[in-house]
Amino acid sequence: MAIDLSHNRWLPALSLSLLALASSAAAGCSSATKDDAAVTEDGSGSSNDDITSVNQSGVKRQSIGNCWLYATTSWLEALNKAETNTELNTSESWLTYWHWYEQLANGRVGTEIETGGWYGTAANLINRYGVVLEKDFIKLEAEAEMSNRQSSALKAANESLKSGPLKDAVARRDRAAIRKELDAAWQLDADTVARIDAVFGAGVERTLDRAFVNAAPGNGILRARDVPIRIKIGAAGQLVSATLADATGTGSSFGTRSGRLAFNTVAYPSDAAGRRAVLKRVQRVLHDQVPVLMSWKVDFNALTQDAHFSLDQLNRLGPGRHGGHMTVAHDYQATVPGIGLLAAGETATPAQMEAALADGTKIEFIRVKNSWGGIRPDRWRDAAIPGYHDLEMAYLDGPIKDCPGEDAPTDPSQCVGTVTPLGDFVLPAGY
């Protein structure tokens, strides 16, 4: 169905129990190679898909475990592009920098910086620190598909945290010293450091949500309220112009986000009826050409050469390297009662999309925009859209073997049980 989000420029109240689940899912993000940072990229590859009907920003490639930030920036770029018809190249590195800073400054770090997270964390970071274009943070990576700077910064910061100045700065809770060490790890130039200081202070005495309520921060930093988006007010509402602040809403200690247009996490149920109900909500959002974030568990032995995640293949090969992941749901393929196959990437009429909401509809796969790069012959030979993957519902429903702590188990008996790969979706209010 042509409800997906394409046109690529470049070639990853909640209950307390769900909060615990989200925290465990935030342990890291899967990347398509053991060490993506070891693979050089010139960022020049590109692909366009002219069949699809909704604008999406370009595919990028994560080099560390921050898929959730790549997914969130893809989401906000698509929302913005729907309103402006222009493509922002926002900086995942910017949000990554602040994610590390908050861990260090708040004493929430062990022997290494945690790279994993989830949507709620990303939304809070955006509200506090805004977004910047990549060219205004890491200039050398303004057009790069993959950020090597993130990988080198993580290595440098962890070394300093282990036995260098960062270890002492964290122990003293010296925010200015923590920022100074992060600036060095990220190899920020003097002009970039000065602009950050001007807005937030050397010791981060200010954040956008508190100090810049009535005035723009300037210095290339955009508040969420400065980023226009286009979105529908609920499934039966009208398309309206809004801002990214409306979509991120306001967080709470319970994990829910408040606001008329706020997106919230919706867990994937365990029963068939509940699953179909949630999938219908996802379909409605995609029908309205709005991107949907989704969290799922990757097992790379399920990845086929044509960019599918297949339960049949996983059952043949047994469990492999695996981990949590977040991507942007983009399109789906389904068999619809009375109609037959609605194929991904092909135009569907309003009547067909309405029929696809029937209880008896069988979704075959969900197509996602990923953060593993566009052209990856080392991992797959072909894909319907470069950089996108088709997650078969049989795989997402599972169950699959759960092997915590085993990077690539050679003995399935090491696995402690089973897990449902599909974890949750992030949906707008009213759906």
Enumerate the language-model features and the residues they cover.
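Bacterial N-terminal signal peptides that target proteins for export
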Residues: 2-17
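Processing junctions and N-termini across compartments
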Residues: 20-23, 61
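N-terminal Sec signal peptide cleavage junction
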Residues: 26-29
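Short, low-complexity, disordered segments immediately C-terminal to signal peptides
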Residues: 33-46
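Active-site nucleophile-adjacent alpha helix/oxyanion-hole segment immediately C-terminal to the catalytic cysteine
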Residues: 43-238, 242-247, 280-288, 292, ...
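Active-site-adjacent substructure of cysteine-protease-like catalytic cores
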Residues: 166-169, 266-367, 430
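Extended, basic/helix-rich recognition subdomains
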Residues: 248, 257, 306-307
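Conserved catalytic-core surface of thiol
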Residues: 335, 340-431
